[in-house]
Amino acid sequence: SAIACGESCVYIPCFIPGCSCRNRVCYLN
């Protein structure tokens, strides 16, 4: 299951390593 990284990526990319943008929210891969 996808684990949210606590970041949004609507206007800026994800900063936490290993996280990617999905549906405007950063998720851990």
Curated annotation (Swiss-Prot):
Disulfide-linked positions: 5-19, 9-21, 14-26
Description of post-translational modifications: This is a cyclic peptide.
Superkingdom: Eukaryota
One Pfam family recorded for the sequence: Cyclotide
Sorted UniProt keywords: Disulfide bond, Knottin, Plant defense
Residue location of crosslink Cyclopeptide (Ser-Asn): 1-29
SUPFAM superfamilies (alphabetical): Cyclotides (SSF57038)
InterPro entries, sorted: Cyclotide, Cyclotide_bracelet_CS, Cyclotide_sf
GO biological-process terms attached to the record: defense response
Coiled coil: none
Keyword Disulfide bond: yes
Function text: Probably participates in a plant defense mechanism.
Family, similarity comment: Belongs to the cyclotide family. Bracelet subfamily.
Domain notes per entry: The presence of a 'disulfide through disulfide knot' structurally defines this protein as a knottin.
Name of protein: Cycloviolacin-H2
Native source organism of the sequence: Viola hederacea (Australian violet)
